[in-house]
Amino acid sequence: NYIDFLKIIITEDKSYFDQQKPLKNKRLKKLRSNDKNSPFYLFSQAEIYIQWAFVRIKFKEYFLAAYELQKAYNLLIQNEELFPDFILNKKNIGVLRILLGSIPDEYNWILRVIGLEGSINSGFDDLYSVLNYTENYEKYNIYEDEVIFYLSFLEMNMRDIKQSKLSLLNKIEDCCLSSDLLVFCAARLSNKIGDNEQTLRILEQVKPSNDKINFYYLDYLYAMSKLYKLNFVEAESSFLRFVNNFEGDNYIKSAYHKLSIISFLTDSLDKRIFYQNKILELGKSFIEEDKYAEKQVKKRKIEDKDLLIARLLFDGGYYQKSLNILESINQSALNNYNLTEYYYRIARLYQKLNYSKNDILDAFYELLALENSYNLYYFPMSNLQIALVYEKEENDEAALIYFQKTLKYDAFDYETGIKKSAKAGLNRILDD
């Protein structure tokens, strides 16, 4: 079941998903024929339900996913009552607590259906306690990679603690770069901490093999890293390798959007038009990156090349280079749309370059004083960043205000991710 779960998650192969569905109940039946006095009896059944729930979410089967999460949670709670010292219960309960603790308000019905209260802080405590066991007790070693994967994904998306990301990155580099799934985690973690050179080094260690599921998303990540370094030739080649080989739907529009950006920056007008048409024709607008790509091509906004290059350098962690370019831009030549991004990018660079708290906050406040006539994500994101600044200062009252302000915005790019981060921030403070 685990192999099917990973294959479906990685390849997004809908036909394989449909083909394997009937096997879920057959596998559960086999598990139920085992020793009922074992702590693995209910735990293993919960694993099956959780894996299928995550796969169903990938294909938007939300109601069935909610049902399966409820089944998994009830089995785990029952198992915890029967075997309170069985540490592996905390693995899945921890994941569920974190994910449900950050769930957007429009999906609160899932919490009601499952009857589980999310708690981000206690969820992380659960997972780190399991990781400790996997490292120190031989019989739990086989779960170490999985727990590191969960923690990496959740630390990237649910918390803003650089040291935690560094610690997980070091663990992966020490033990696990033979696993493409953990290569993916290491690449994303190094990008999150702003070290694009390390991301490239990690991805360049991937060796193709006929024995592995093709993980084409690694080509996408490699292309992104080359784009951040302004290596347009290699970036274009890797994006094309991704779109020509990956048979799923996610990141296709995003990849073609990046190809159109490369064409714009290299003055290849015909190729830009070709790639923009592909954005509208191929892939689906399910994940935030693809929604953004489709919106951008439909808006037909006039981009500023220097501002775009500064954005790419920023995303790759080349912060001083990005700031140097921004400081060379004539602000009076920017339209209102681009001027908003200019102020936002300055504020974010002040953060990354460790300017004083007052300089950072003043830069964000300057942006928020502008009129949000384009419904841009820079405004809710600025409120979110202000909240995070206050949270680090342990000024919980001010942080709560700005997390709540973030949640009041609607209909903007990256809305799901930004609101999830704001909700997670609220819950972190309220948990304490």
Regions found by a protein language model. Give the residues of each.
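"A position-specific structural signal for the A-helix of alpha-solenoid helical repeats
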Residues: 3-6, 44, 48-51, 92, ...
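Short coil/linker segments at helix-helix boundaries
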Residues: 2-174, 291-295
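Alpha-helical adaptor scaffolds
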Residues: 145-152, 156-157, 191-192, 307-316, ...
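Residue at a conserved register position within TPR or TPR-like alpha-solenoid repeats
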Residues: 4, 11, 49, 56, ...
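Generic helix N-cap/helix-start motif at coil->alpha-helix transitions
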Residues: 38, 86-87, 105, 140-149, ...
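Residue-level detector of the short coil/turn that links helix A to helix B
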Residues: 60, 67, 159-160, 194, ...
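Solenoid-like repeat scaffolds
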Residues: 33-36, 81-82, 112-117, 132-137, ...
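Single-residue signature of alpha-solenoid repeat helices
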Residues: 20, 27, 65, 72, ...
